[in-house]
Amino acid sequence: MIKVVPKVLVMSGYGINCETETAHAFQKAGAETDIVHINDLIAGKKKMADYEIIMFPGGFSYGDDTGSGNAFANKIKNNLFDDLTEFINSGKLILGICNGFQVMTNLGLFALPSTDYGERISALESNTNNRYECRWVHIKENDSVCVFTKGINVTHVPIAHGEGRFYCDEKTYHELKENKQIVFSYCDSEGNPANGEYPLNPNGAYQDIAGICDKTGRIFGLMPHPERSLYSISEPEYQLKKEIAKRNGDIIPEFIENNLQIFKNAVEYFNK
């Protein structure tokens, strides 16, 4: 069987700043990547339909003016939403990280069984402490329908945001939970729920929610940055872990496998 190498459209422009590391993550997972400015899509120089995965990276699109991810989402709504809807209906994948999650939230891409694409069901509000949070956290994969997170339990990832507090109303929360659309929740290093406790839950997210997906499991967004934490050397405790491993005659693996697995799962989706 010939292995399919999916092509990833890594969105760029107007303050997005995580294109390179995001493209690198997909390349390490076995995909081909193109970093494409949104204006090239609007001008027709590149087409969403030519790709299998659309990636909305992190950053500060439009400087978070009018709210994080809002202006970039409006540019897509006004120019590319028909193309995006066609892409979704074709059964392909979309991933958004941090600002990308905020863009996708504003676009209304996390459809419930009771809603259509384009209907916004949640928000990502200012952190409870009204501070920009830049730290490492633990997140736990729930029993979800998300295709990106199979085989992952607890993983260690960095966050970097000022508006990452997930919020939805109680009715929406219960529908997300019942349909297994709550993908990642903040937790401690053992996988125990954060229960809103800072800094385990770094932003005050409702029900500790760090990431959700749409009703199909093919569209996924999260606030933490797995693409920034592929390598073990990036962890803040790396030198300590390295010394302990050395004394025990062990070697630290090159990759934080759970974080790389998110991108591998996307590639493997097209090889089932």
Curated annotation (Swiss-Prot):
Its EC number is 6.3.5.3, 3.5.1.2. One of its GO terms (biological process) is 'de novo' IMP biosynthetic process. It is found in: Cytoplasm. Pathway: Purine metabolism; IMP biosynthesis via de novo pathway; 5-amino-1-(5-phospho-D-ribosyl)imidazole from N(2)-formyl-N(1)-(5-phospho-D-ribosyl)glycinamide: step 1/2. One of its GO terms (molecular function) is phosphoribosylformylglycinamidine synthase activity. GO terms for cellular component: cytoplasm. It catalyses: N(2)-formyl-N(1)-(5-phospho-beta-D-ribosyl)glycinamide + L-glutamine + ATP + H2O = 2-formamido-N(1)-(5-O-phospho-beta-D-ribosyl)acetamidine + L-glutamate + ADP + phosphate + H(+); L-glutamine + H2O = L-glutamate + NH4(+). Pfam families: GATase_5. The active site is at residues 98, 225, 227, 235. This is Phosphoribosylformylglycinamidine synthase subunit PurQ. It comes from Methanococcus maripaludis (strain DSM 14266 / JCM 13030 / NBRC 101832 / S2 / LL).
